[in-house]
Protein backbone atom coordinates (compact mmCIF):
# COMPACT_ATOMS: atom_id res chain seq x y z
CA UNK A 1 0.00 0.00 0.00
CA UNK A 2 2.87 2.37 0.72
CA UNK A 3 4.21 2.07 -2.81
CA UNK A 4 0.73 2.73 -4.22
CA UNK A 5 0.27 5.72 -1.90
CA UNK A 6 3.58 7.18 -3.02
CA UNK A 7 2.63 6.67 -6.68
CA UNK A 8 -0.67 8.47 -6.05
CA UNK A 9 1.08 11.49 -4.55
CA UNK A 10 1.45 10.87 -0.81
CA UNK A 11 4.32 12.94 0.58
CA UNK A 12 4.79 10.84 3.72
CA UNK A 13 3.80 7.39 4.98
CA UNK A 14 2.74 6.52 8.50
CA UNK A 15 3.64 2.87 8.80
CA UNK A 16 1.63 0.83 11.27
CA UNK A 17 -0.01 -2.54 11.70
CA UNK A 18 -3.59 -3.35 12.70
CA UNK A 19 -5.24 -0.19 11.43
CA UNK A 20 -8.61 -1.52 12.61
CA UNK A 21 -7.64 -0.61 16.20
CA UNK A 22 -6.11 2.75 15.30
CA UNK A 23 -2.69 1.38 14.39
CA UNK A 24 -0.03 -0.51 16.31
CA UNK A 25 3.73 -0.84 15.93
CA UNK A 26 4.68 -2.67 12.74
CA UNK A 27 7.35 -5.36 12.89
CA UNK A 28 10.95 -4.24 12.55
CA UNK A 29 11.25 -6.26 9.32
CA UNK A 30 8.22 -4.47 7.86
CA UNK A 31 9.89 -1.14 8.60
CA UNK A 32 13.15 -2.21 6.96
CA UNK A 33 11.27 -3.42 3.88
CA UNK A 34 9.35 -0.15 3.62
CA UNK A 35 12.57 1.86 3.79
CA UNK A 36 13.99 -0.20 0.91
CA UNK A 37 11.12 0.55 -1.45
CA UNK A 38 9.83 4.01 -0.54
CA UNK A 39 11.38 7.30 -1.59
CA UNK A 40 9.25 9.46 0.70
CA UNK A 41 9.65 9.92 4.46
CA UNK A 42 8.41 7.06 6.62
CA UNK A 43 7.00 7.79 10.09
CA UNK A 44 6.53 4.67 12.19
CA UNK A 45 3.83 4.10 14.80
CA UNK A 46 5.20 3.18 18.22
CA UNK A 47 2.25 1.64 20.04
CA UNK A 48 2.62 -1.83 21.57
CA UNK A 49 -1.06 -2.62 22.10
CA UNK A 50 -4.61 -1.35 21.69
CA UNK A 51 -7.16 -0.26 24.37
CA UNK A 52 -5.77 2.91 25.89
CA UNK A 53 -2.62 5.02 25.97
CA UNK A 54 -1.68 4.41 29.61
CA UNK A 55 1.41 2.22 29.54
CA UNK A 56 3.16 0.11 32.16
CA UNK A 57 6.82 0.53 32.99
CA UNK A 58 7.65 -2.60 30.97
CA UNK A 59 5.68 -1.35 27.94
CA UNK A 60 7.51 1.98 28.11
CA UNK A 61 10.86 0.18 28.20
CA UNK A 62 9.87 -1.78 25.09
CA UNK A 63 8.76 1.43 23.35
CA UNK A 64 12.08 3.13 24.12
CA UNK A 65 13.98 0.16 22.72
CA UNK A 66 11.79 0.24 19.62
CA UNK A 67 12.59 3.95 19.16
CA UNK A 68 16.32 3.23 19.47
CA UNK A 69 16.03 0.51 16.83
CA UNK A 70 14.13 2.82 14.47
CA UNK A 71 16.66 5.60 14.96
CA UNK A 72 19.50 3.19 14.12
CA UNK A 73 17.99 2.44 10.71
CA UNK A 74 17.40 6.14 9.95
CA UNK A 75 13.60 6.26 10.12
CA UNK A 76 12.47 9.84 9.46
CA UNK A 77 9.97 10.04 12.30
CA UNK A 78 7.86 8.29 14.89
CA UNK A 79 4.19 8.56 15.85
CA UNK A 80 3.59 8.00 19.56
CA UNK A 81 1.43 9.09 22.46
CA UNK A 82 1.23 8.33 26.16
CA UNK A 83 -1.21 9.49 28.84
CA UNK A 84 -1.32 9.10 32.60
CA UNK A 85 -4.25 7.83 34.66
CA UNK A 86 -5.52 11.40 35.16
CA UNK A 87 -6.12 11.83 31.43
CA UNK A 88 -3.09 14.07 30.96
CA UNK A 89 0.06 13.83 28.87
CA UNK A 90 2.60 11.47 30.45
CA UNK A 91 5.17 14.27 30.39
CA UNK A 92 8.03 12.35 32.02
CA UNK A 93 7.81 9.53 29.50
CA UNK A 94 7.38 11.90 26.56
CA UNK A 95 10.48 13.86 27.65
CA UNK A 96 12.41 10.59 27.60
CA UNK A 97 11.00 9.82 24.14
CA UNK A 98 12.20 13.19 22.82
CA UNK A 99 15.64 12.73 24.37
CA UNK A 100 16.06 9.28 22.77
CA UNK A 101 14.34 9.96 19.43
CA UNK A 102 15.76 13.29 18.28
CA UNK A 103 16.66 14.25 15.61
CA UNK A 104 13.82 12.04 14.34
CA UNK A 105 10.58 13.91 13.86
CA UNK A 106 8.03 13.17 16.60
CA UNK A 107 4.27 13.21 16.10
CA UNK A 108 1.99 12.87 19.12
CA UNK A 109 -0.90 10.79 17.83
CA UNK A 110 -4.62 10.84 18.50
CA UNK A 111 -4.16 10.08 22.20
CA UNK A 112 -4.39 13.89 22.33
CA UNK A 113 -8.12 13.60 21.63
CA UNK A 114 -8.58 11.74 24.93
CA UNK A 115 -7.00 14.32 27.26
CA UNK A 116 -9.13 16.25 29.74
CA UNK A 117 -7.51 19.67 29.20
CA UNK A 118 -6.60 20.00 25.53
CA UNK A 119 -4.95 23.42 25.71
CA UNK A 120 -2.77 22.44 28.66
CA UNK A 121 -1.77 19.26 26.82
CA UNK A 122 -0.75 21.17 23.69
CA UNK A 123 1.30 23.61 25.76
CA UNK A 124 3.06 20.65 27.42
CA UNK A 125 3.82 19.04 24.05
CA UNK A 126 5.29 22.30 22.75
CA UNK A 127 7.45 22.65 25.85
CA UNK A 128 8.65 19.04 25.59
CA UNK A 129 9.66 19.52 21.95
CA UNK A 130 7.08 17.51 20.00
CA UNK A 131 6.96 18.48 16.30
CA UNK A 132 3.42 17.49 15.29
CA UNK A 133 0.06 16.59 16.76
CA UNK A 134 -2.29 14.24 14.93
CA UNK A 135 -5.83 15.22 15.90
CA UNK A 136 -9.47 15.07 14.90
CA UNK A 137 -10.35 17.75 17.43
CA UNK A 138 -11.80 15.35 20.03
CA UNK A 139 -14.35 14.05 17.50
CA UNK A 140 -14.43 10.92 15.33
CA UNK A 141 -14.33 13.01 12.15
CA UNK A 142 -12.27 16.14 11.55
CA UNK A 143 -15.20 17.67 9.66
CA UNK A 144 -17.22 17.59 12.91
CA UNK A 145 -14.59 19.70 14.69
CA UNK A 146 -13.87 22.51 12.22
CA UNK A 147 -14.31 25.35 14.71
CA UNK A 148 -12.22 23.65 17.38
CA UNK A 149 -9.43 22.74 14.96
CA UNK A 150 -9.28 26.28 13.56
CA UNK A 151 -9.07 27.69 17.08
CA UNK A 152 -6.23 25.46 18.25
CA UNK A 153 -4.32 26.07 15.04
CA UNK A 154 -4.73 29.83 15.50
CA UNK A 155 -3.58 29.63 19.13
CA UNK A 156 -0.68 27.20 18.78
CA UNK A 157 0.01 26.63 15.08
CA UNK A 158 3.16 28.75 15.07
CA UNK A 159 4.73 26.52 17.73
CA UNK A 160 3.60 23.04 16.69
CA UNK A 161 2.21 21.55 13.48
CA UNK A 162 -1.33 20.21 13.64
CA UNK A 163 -2.12 17.31 11.33
CA UNK A 164 -5.86 16.96 10.76
CA UNK A 165 -7.10 13.37 10.90
CA UNK A 166 -10.36 11.49 11.21
CA UNK A 167 -12.12 10.12 8.12
CA UNK A 168 -10.21 12.34 5.69
CA UNK A 169 -10.31 10.98 2.15
CA UNK A 170 -9.56 12.14 -1.36
CA UNK A 171 -13.27 12.99 -1.63
CA UNK A 172 -13.45 15.44 1.28
CA UNK A 173 -9.88 16.77 1.45
CA UNK A 174 -10.43 19.89 -0.68
CA UNK A 175 -13.56 20.87 1.22
CA UNK A 176 -11.81 20.40 4.57
CA UNK A 177 -8.75 22.32 3.43
CA UNK A 178 -10.94 25.24 2.33
CA UNK A 179 -12.38 25.38 5.85
CA UNK A 180 -9.27 24.58 7.90
CA UNK A 181 -6.28 25.66 5.82
CA UNK A 182 -3.98 23.26 7.70
CA UNK A 183 -0.55 22.47 6.30
CA UNK A 184 -0.91 18.71 6.78
CA UNK A 185 -3.67 16.12 6.57
CA UNK A 186 -3.71 12.42 7.43
CA UNK A 187 -5.87 9.61 6.11
CA UNK A 188 -5.59 6.08 4.82
CA UNK A 189 -7.48 7.02 1.64
CA UNK A 190 -6.31 10.60 1.30
CA UNK A 191 -4.66 10.07 -2.10
CA UNK A 192 -7.24 7.56 -3.30
CA UNK A 193 -8.26 4.06 -2.43
CA UNK A 194 -5.21 1.81 -2.25
CA UNK A 195 -6.75 -1.64 -2.50
Annotate each predicted stretch with a short phrase:
Residues 38-51, 100-112, 156-165:
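Short beta-strand/loop segments at the ligand-binding rim of alpha/beta enzyme cores
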Residues 8-23, 69, 73-85, 128-143, ...:
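Glycine-rich phosphate-binding active-site loops on the catalytic face of alpha/beta enzymes
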Residues 16-18, 49-52:
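Glycine-/proline-rich flexible loop or hinge segments
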Residues 10-12, 44-47, 75-76, 99-103, ...:
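A short alpha-helix capping/helix-coil boundary motif
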Residues 2-3, 19-43, 58-61, 83-102, ...:
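Active-site-adjacent beta->alpha loops and helix N-cap segments on the catalytic face
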Residues 1-8, 55-69, 113-128, 150-164, ...:
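Catalytic cores of alpha/beta
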Amino acid sequence: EGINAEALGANRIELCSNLAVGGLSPSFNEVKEALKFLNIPVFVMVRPREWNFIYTKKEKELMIQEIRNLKNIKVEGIVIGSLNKKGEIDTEFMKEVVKIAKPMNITFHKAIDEVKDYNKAIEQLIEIGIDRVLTSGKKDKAEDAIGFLKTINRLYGNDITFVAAGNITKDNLDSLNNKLDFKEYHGKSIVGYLK
